[in-house]
Amino acid sequence: MLQIGEDVDYLLIPREVRLAGGVWRVISKPATKEAVFRERLIQFLQEEGRTLEDVARIIEKSTPHPPQPPKKAKVPRVRRVPQMVTPPLRLVVGTYDSSNGSDSELSDFDTSKVKGNRGSGKTRKVRKMPVSYLGSKFLGSDESEDDQELVEAFLRRGEKKPSAPPPRRRVNLPVPMFENNLGPQPSKGDRWREYVSQVSWGKLKQRVRGWAPRSGSEVGQAQQSSIAERAGEMRHSHTSPDLDDSSRNTGDLSDQTLITRRWKPKIKWVSLRRCRKEQVPPLAHGTAEEPPEAAENQGAGAAAEHGVEAAASQRPEAAASPRAEAAANPRAEATANPRAEAAANPRAEAAASPRAEAAANPRAEAAANPRAEATANPRAEAAANPRAEATANPRAEAAVNPRTEAAVNPRTEAAANPRAEAAVNPRAEATASPRAEAEVNQKTEATASPRAETAASPRVEAAASLRVEAAASPRAEATVSPRAEAVATPRAETAASARVEAAANLRAGVLPDQRAEAIDSQRAEGPVNQSTGATENQRVEVLADQRAGVLHDQREEAGPQAILEASADSGSRARKQVKTVRFQTPGRFSWFHMRRKAFWHTPRLPTLPKRGPRAGAGEARSLRVLRADTRADMEHREQEEQL
């Protein structure tokens, strides 16, 4: 009778132990039951006039002394292949870690003979290869390590870092017991790499049946690189993702490491807007017919982006000068070109500056200031007023004001020059409200016809309907296909000039650039139109507000993404890449769910034993299946042991 501590898991108590005289069955009972049992036993013995010693003697006598194996049904469990000779018993000194019952050496060596014990399944199912080492060099290594090494590995389990990668000793060198702390200890990654390099890649791949690299720049290209590099490459890609990323940024680093991966930029659409703002301006510079406008586009973009301050400065000037010109005159004139220029120039700058200002008080001042200047008076009113309002509730009021219409409109007008053209007309119409008036110049163009219609009415409707309608007005079209048509439209032409690049790109489907340029110039223009200060903010507002002018700014609001989509919709519908999964074959991971078809002949990684048939399942399975199952199980187990 063994006394067992309270929190011991009964499942971990071996069912039988080989001790002197053979195999002892261990009957464990919870302490309470145990106490009851002893009490009753003693009571019984007293009645019988016997003592515990007598009982012990009787038991002793009744036990066949050379313990003959019970003639029980040990038969099914007999191995078809005679079992390997069990290794001579070694004293394994180590702690028994009951949390890892499967690793106990005791049950491994001591009960390896006792196949029969059903109960010992828990302990008997010892993996020769402790689970903790599945990922290690033992996994695929071709040398069959002798048990000695495995035992050492098991005992080494606790130590966090072995002083060297696990000894690959063919020759038993004396191993000094002190750790050489001289060099820096290899990191976990280094050790893993050390392991991996000892496994031939081909072997590993054979082992892991369905294995294929994660499709991705890393491993995919790693495979193309020569096998020699492969291990190193895997090493790097696995160990130092951070190093890798940094190397991604710093070109030289990646060259130092032997990774010759092509650098594929990771693109997030959000970043596109920024990039476009920064890059397109130079593009605009080169491309735009009017470098100034391109510059201002830049200004719009850059200013819009960076420089609310920059915007502030540029915008006021641009707003004041070009905007005034562009707004009053050029808006209409500039429509074709000046609009681009005006757009680019005043808008960019106007965008930049008022944007910046607009940023601060932006709409109000920026609007008031550049818009006022730019717009002359109406813009000033529209700007100051609706702008201020627009600033506050820019879109909402803007919606009320043509400014909203204009705001959406500017988009529209920005999109379609008609707005510029319309500016004169619809602006008159749009003129209804100060913004409209203010925008009459600018927005009138913007107002165009749909704009005009839309303009007076809610910009928002205008936006929505306009965007819808927008089909009607180029902006609408431009909206729908806005940039594409915008290309068609003067504004587009303006865009075409300023955005020629953009225009071409523009709806053409060079979304990003076009959008960027469109964004820059139109932003410049659109914002100028919409709100002098609106450029960046307007875009933002336009986002917010034009969201009011939703359709419009759906593009805006969706931002580059929407931009992309919108123009993808219009211009490059064909170009939009949809990733379809063509064949749903049992692909890379079939090995995972088709596991049951184990191939008896292939060496398998140790798996948990299949559970015996459940209680209810008996009827369902024919005996034949059961027998096959058992046989498979036996073979599996024996293979495991050989492994």
Curated annotation (Swiss-Prot):
Q: Which domain of life is it from?
A: Eukaryota
Cellular location(s): Cytoplasm; Cytoplasm, Cytoskeleton, Microtubule organizing center, Centrosome
The annotated region (Disordered) lies at: 93-124, 156-191, 206-492, 519-540, 553-577, 603-643
Q: What is the lineage of its organism?
A: Eukaryota, Metazoa, Chordata, Craniata, Vertebrata
- Look up keyword Cytoplasm and say if it applies: yes
Q: Listed GO cellular component terms?
A: 3M complex; centrosome; cytoplasm
UniProt xrefs under InterPro entries: Coiled-coil_p8
UniProt feature, compositional bias: Basic and acidic residues: 230-247, 626-643
GO BP, sorted A to Z: microtubule cytoskeleton organization; regulation of mitotic nuclear division
Comment, domains: The PxLPxI/L motif mediates interaction with ankyrin repeats of ANKRA2.
**What spans are recorded as compositionally biased (Polar residues)?**
218-227, 248-259, 528-537
Give the keywords, sorted.
Answer: Cytoplasm, Cytoskeleton, Phosphoprotein
In the record, which positions carry Phosphoserine? 141, 144
Q: How does it assemble?
A: Component of the 3M complex, composed of core components CUL7, CCDC8 and OBSL1. Interacts (via PxLPxI/L motif) with ANKRA2 (via ankyrin repeats); may link the 3M complex to histone deacetylases including HDAC4 and HDAC5.
| Additional comment | Despite its name, does not contain a coiled coil domain.
Give the species this sequence originates from. Rattus norvegicus (Rat)
User: What is the recorded name of this protein?
Assistant: Coiled-coil domain-containing protein 8
Role noted for this protein: Core component of the 3M complex, a complex required to regulate microtubule dynamics and genome integrity. It is unclear how the 3M complex regulates microtubules, it could act by controlling the level of a microtubule stabilizer. Required for localization of CUL7 to the centrosome.
Return the Low complexity bias intervals: 294-399, 409-432, 459-473
- Quick one: where is this thing mainly located? cytoplasm
Stretches of Basic residues bias are at 261-276
Which positions does the motif PxLPxI/L motif occupy? 603-609
Q: List the PANTHER family hit by this protein, alphabetically.
A: COILED COIL DOMAIN-CONTAINING PROTEIN 8, CCDC8, COILED-COIL DOMAIN-CONTAINING PROTEIN 8
